[in-house]
């Protein structure tokens, strides 16, 4: 009797599981795909003032991230990575997008209107279907793409995208945050250009990472020496938006000769309305990594605080000006002009 009762309960449980599965997939794949498309479009369109978009089309999380490793000076030219670009975008229900870009003062102030579409295959895809400022990055040099795959939101609620351009992880960075005022569409890009140009105008930028009196890293090499043999390197820094902060491990006893041994930390950069953002970041080690700097007078500064990551259920370090409520760590970084 107990045996039959057990079989009956097992059958009932199986039927319940089947009914549960049916309720999970109560809509067709076509309907679910359309719902995902509609949800992303509604989200993009519903931001009344538009979006601030940071796009690093090609990054390398391993390039110049080992401050104890010697750097052959023959590799300084031609070995730099690539930085990012700042856009503002406003999407409308009729599939139009108004865009500004940080390429120049003109593109920062002159809006360009193009068309976008949203489709669904394996991912929900945002496509910029007619020519826009973004397409200036869609080439072999920058390896950009006009088709963005929606990956969800980060712990701060920003929209995160990737492209099919790169198969390996951490090779690009696309982040969208809603603007907070009607003036943001114009002012954010203009300010990002101003901050980037201020950094690029530094004659001898140096980086210091410290915690109280303990210095983890401090660059001291004059990378941007204004000599004819340095012209190609100076052009590469500006064109690629990448900077390498160099520390001299062993100086040359012969005056005015290149040092015998150097090391450094490098990253691509982009100007923001608050200062600078570096990706893949100025990464001293797995823990001490600086991404977002705020401009303070003639310096760029960052202070790391600890916050709880609700997605990963662990703590992470972020810049204090983005999370003033975070726990103070005392880890700071400054970029200044040692001219």
Residue ranges of predicted features:
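N-terminal glycine/threonine-rich, aromatic-flanked beta-hairpin/loop signature
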Residues: 68-123, 215-280
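Acidic/polar, low-complexity intrinsically disordered N-terminal segments immediately downstream
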Residues: 19-115, 123, 183-199
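Elongated scaffolding segments in large macromolecular assemblies
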Residues: 184-240
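Bacterial N-terminal signal peptides that target proteins for export
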Residues: 1-6
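Edge beta-strand at a domain terminus
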Residues: 23-30, 158-208, 306-339
